[in-house]
Amino acid sequence: MARYTGASCRLCRREGEKLYLKGERCTTNKCAIARRGYAPGQHGQNKKKLSEYGLQLREKQKARRYYGILEGQFRRYFEMAVKKKGITGENLLQILESRLDNVVYRMGLAVSRREARQLVRHGHFTVNGKRVDIPSYLVKVGDVIAVKEKSKSSPKMQSNKEYAAGRPRPKWLEYDAEEMSGKVVALPAREDIDLPIRENLIVELYSK
């Protein structure tokens, strides 16, 4: 299955809420949800009541789209979550939050998860001093994520550094603005994850 390459705004309209796929644009009146808050397509304005399965499926799709993950990988994360101790749904969100591209976004060094994924792929970040260009890399407590030294002076990273200065960060991440680096000081708890995801519906869907 290929990665989605269409218009990001269509995904937000499909889910009926902002997925913040375009960074700051999503907070302005240019946002597609603000202008056309209904699903795309000929029958988008005709809302119909979803079945139980439909609600579960929509919640799973929404979570996938927040993090930019394909179905196969998302299911593997769910299987990992099942094997971990604790509540499966919360384990799943914890795994998703631990992806390197998400951590870069949470640090404020990318305006969206999509941009974070591109920056990681292009080799602009290190983990514990070693270059890592795999967006799905799962960070651990104690890991230090930093902008590669050669990349710090690039116009893009300097722009993102300024952007990061005004961004709130979750308490499980420490951020050093001068070094353009962050440290994972704890695993994210459910209350640290500010996304409107009903993970229990995803668990119900995959448990059938």
Curated annotation (Swiss-Prot):
GO-annotated biological processes: ribosomal small subunit biogenesis; translation
GO CC terms in record: small ribosomal subunit
Source domain of life: Bacteria
A Pfam family annotated for this UniProt entry: Ribosomal_S4
CDD domains on file: S4 (cd00165)
Statement: the UniProt record of this protein carries the keyword rRNA processing: no
Keywords of this entry: Ribonucleoprotein, Ribosomal protein, RNA-binding, rRNA-binding
One GO MF term attached to the UniProt entry: rRNA binding
Keyword Ribosomal protein in record: yes
Every S4 RNA-binding domain range: 98-178
Function: One of the primary rRNA binding proteins, it binds directly to 16S rRNA where it nucleates assembly of the body of the 30S subunit. With S5 and S12 plays an important role in translational accuracy.
PANTHER family tied to this protein: 30S 40S RIBOSOMAL PROTEIN, SMALL RIBOSOMAL SUBUNIT PROTEIN US4M
UniProt similarity note: Belongs to the universal ribosomal protein uS4 family.
Subunit composition and interactions: Part of the 30S ribosomal subunit. Contacts protein S5. The interaction surface between S4 and S5 is involved in control of translational fidelity.
Protein's UniProt name: Small ribosomal subunit protein uS4
Organism from which the protein derives: Acetivibrio thermocellus (strain ATCC 27405 / DSM 1237 / JCM 9322 / NBRC 103400 / NCIMB 10682 / NRRL B-4536 / VPI 7372) (Clostridium thermocellum)
